[in-house]
């Protein structure tokens, strides 16, 4: 059984310039992710999908295969699902593989066990496995939106009873960007993660940080040496 890891890193980033090449400690986010993938024994090959020559050059030092991504799949509003499909089609021209493993560059605090647990969990009759964490917010209890006449209202009103405590609300979780593992054909034949059988691995909050803002980057730099 062949397991291939894919790292997707665009050159453009609105909130943090050159985000994927920002350093946490002595290494860039890209380098950290590449080394995390290389430490997993049952990952047999690693690919980088990017539209950036600068990112590609940085990755080549680590002896991985580069997939140059078309510009139409690299815009701010481009769905990464289509980038996944593009990468799988590219690899399928040369190799056949059984598990697609995506390691987003923006989650440098992940551990080896998080990745290994996701790879194993796919064997339990799932099409794709995601990672989740406990959340402090709940759309039935303390998350609101602006409704008619700019009045605030609870996001989800589908339950026909008043929920006045967090414990009475349905249990919900945050999706994280720690790791995704899927059957390659599932990605090729569907349009989104939740089109089929979705499994999940719980990740503790301290390993689930997703770097999206300058504040997230500062927090990662504080936490990284301690993980």
Predicted regions and their residues:
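Conserved core of the sugar-phosphate nucleotidyltransferase
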Residues: 82, 86, 108-197, 202-203
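N-terminal glycine-rich phosphate-binding loop and ensuing alpha1 helix
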Residues: 2-49
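Short phosphate-binding loop-to-helix
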Residues: 47, 53-100, 109-113, 117
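Short, high-confidence coil segments that cap the C-terminus of an alpha-helix
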Residues: 43, 95-97, 125-127
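Catalytic metal- and UDP-sugar-binding loop of GT-A-like glycosyltransferases, i.e.
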Residues: 103
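Short beta-strand scaffold positions
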Residues: 48-50, 181, 211
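Hydrophobic helical membrane-anchoring modules
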Residues: 200-202, 206-227
